[in-house]
Amino acid sequence: LRDLGYDVERIEKRARTRIRYTQKKFSPQRQLAATAALEHITAIMADGLLRNDAYMADAHPALARLWRWHALEETEHKAVAFDVYNQVCGSRKLLRRAMLMGTFFFVLDTTRGLAHMLKVDGLLWNWRVWRDGIRWMWGKEGVFRPLISAYLDFFKDGFHPWEHNNLDLLHATREEFDGAPLIQAGAA
């Protein structure tokens, strides 16, 4: 990304600053609630990626494989922080508030990163790029639209991440990687 002109250090610094602030100002229970909430977001995104090959259809094969592996990893541990949180604290109110705040900052930070990359590419003010991007994310066949229901499930009383049972998908995807290194020598 640096070679393409993106200021990776700036993006990483913003993330480090947010993490340090959270560690300084938030209780351990609130930090754990935020982790559980954000893990739900990454889990439902991972599920979407694993279910829809079209999302990575135009990606370089090594990059597509890396993203599938990462989605697999996110799926495997999707309930760990949630289960620990329930044992340690268990407040649904705090968990819901953490999801709302986590969602806000997730959207804010990813939009800032996207805007930086579009600016570097000279596309920040290209309305067609924004229109097409919004359609790709939220349109009828968009990436995020199918995730709305799973996202909202988090706010239900008694919800647990494994209620979105995708063990079949997890096992099928794991078969792609068992016995094979993520990036083989000479690949890429």
State what each model feature region is.
Residues 1-188:
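Non-heme di-metal
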